[in-house]
Each structure stands twice: as structure tokens, then as C-alpha cells.
Amino acid sequence: MSTFPTPNMALTTILVVADIERSVAWYRDVLGAELYREYGESSAVFSFTGAWLLLVTGGAPTPDKPDVEFAAPIDPTTVDHSFTIRVEDCRAAYGTLRERGAEFLTPPYDWGGEIRCFFRDPDDHLFEISQAG
């Protein structure tokens, strides 16, 4: 029996996007992720804070994922996943990301034990920056 997980495993998050060129520019220039590799006009891999982000355009079912279709988010008011980026200074991160073009839902909000705010990528994937209070 093999071991799972193994020490050299890595988790990659797949995000379905409508326009790969627009998304590559946003993840590189706004979020500050490092572009690792592009695969034509259908996908791109980024390294960000020790994690992998794979951006893909939509896709039909395949033999290894029958009955599963990849599609970009449709309704920005309904979220089935989000990303939390823990930072030392939420307000500073907010300022930097706004300068780069990130569009926030609100300025940082102080909950007492946490300061946080949310922004979206061009396809409405939700990101949170959070500072422990």
C-alpha cells in the first residue's frame, strides 16, 4: 500500500476563466502571481504564495471526467469557493492591490479579531485578504 499524501505532493487549484489572455494579465499584474507556464490559448499555470493556480478556459466532459463540464462563474452574488490570503497588514495590501487595479467590494472592515476585505478577479472568483486582529 502506498503512502498518501507524500512529502512532495502539491495542491493545484483550477479556475475556469472566460478569456485566458485577460486573466493571465490580471493574475500577473494585479495579484502579483508568477507565471510558470502557458499552454496556448487554453490554460496557464501560476505560482502564488507556495500554491499553484491553473487557469483554464471552459471545457466539455472528457473520458476521465465524464458528465463534468468546466465553466466560468455565472452569478457573482453566489459563491461556491473563495480564496483567503492571510497578510500581516490588510490595509496596506488593500492599498497595493487597488493601485494595481483590483476592484474591492468594500474597504477593509475591522471585525475586532480580524480585519478583512474582498475583491474579485475578472471572472468573479472571490478573493479575501485577511489580517488577524
Task: Tell where the protein language model's regions lie, with residue ranges.
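Short, conserved charged micro-motifs
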Residues: 22-23, 90-94
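Vicinal oxygen chelate
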Residues: 1-12, 34-85, 92-120, 131-133
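Conserved beta-strand-loop-alpha-helix junction that forms the acyl-donor binding cleft
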Residues: 14-19
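Conserved active-site tyrosine of GNAT-family acetyltransferases
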Residues: 23-28, 97, 124
